[in-house]
């Protein structure tokens, strides 16, 4: 097992030289953040990210994440092109020593945290989720702390409507279709996928 730390790229408020100071730290878990979901991560962007890590003596073996486009999750006709792009991302990342890609297949919302600064009894802070706080939110006009507001309210409502009526079995079938499409690239590169 290797000790790694989440790093949100060059704009992260925690610089790599701080991460390197953590005893036993061997690498970072990061991603390319300036490419639209579904597009190919060009090798020059990956190389630049890896060079930043290398400069600080940190490995870049884990990527979290290469986002899965909603059209793939929904099983739309555009999914085959998007899956091909995802497979190319796997191949491109493999050229730079990446061994694991973390991803999710959750519809619309990657994650929910209702508080980015939950204060514990010892004074430490952490991210937290409260079901009670979540249930108070207007699901059609969500604004959560630290959330990437990728969608306008109209786009969000459209996506939610697209998922209306989708069964668990249909979503799972779309996940299997996606995995069947990307596994050849994983086999070629030796990259593991972590959901």
Describe the role of every protein-language-model region:
Residues 31-47, 109-111:
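Glycine-rich, proline-tolerant flexible connector loops at the mouths of alpha/beta enzymes
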Residues 6-10, 30-35, 65-68, 105-108, ...:
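Active-site beta-loop-alpha junctions enriched in small/polar residues
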Residues 1-3:
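Extreme N-terminal starter segment of soluble prokaryotic enzymes
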Residues 72-195:
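Active-site acidic/histidine proton-transfer and metal-coordination neighborhood
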Residues 19, 28-30, 53, 93, ...:
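Conserved, mostly hydrophobic/aromatic
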């Amino acid at each position: 097992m290797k000790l790694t730390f989440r790093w949100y790229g060059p704009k992260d408020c925690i610089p790599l030289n701080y991460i390197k100071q953590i005893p036993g730290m061997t690498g970072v878990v990061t991603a390319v953040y300036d490419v639209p979901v579904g597009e190919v991560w060009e090798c020059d962007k990956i190389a630049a990210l890896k060079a930043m890590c290398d400069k600080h003596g940190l490995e870049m073996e884990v990527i979290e994440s290469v986002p899965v486009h909603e059209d793939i999750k929904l099983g739309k006709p555009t999914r085959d092109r998007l899956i091909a792009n995802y497979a190319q991302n796997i191949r491109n990342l493999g050229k730079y020593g990446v061994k694991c890609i973390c991803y999710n297949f959750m519809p619309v919302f990657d994650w929910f945290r209702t508080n980015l600064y939950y204060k514990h009894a010892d004074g430490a802070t952490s991210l937290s989720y409260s079901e009670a706080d979540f249930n108070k939110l207007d699901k059609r006009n969500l604004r959560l702390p630290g959330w990437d507001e990728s969608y306008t309210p109209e786009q969000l409502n459209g996506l939610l409507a697209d998922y209306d009526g989708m069964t668990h079995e249909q979503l799972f079938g779309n996940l299997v279709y996606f995995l069947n499409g990307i596994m050849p690239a994983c086999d070629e590169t030796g990259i593991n996928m972590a959901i």
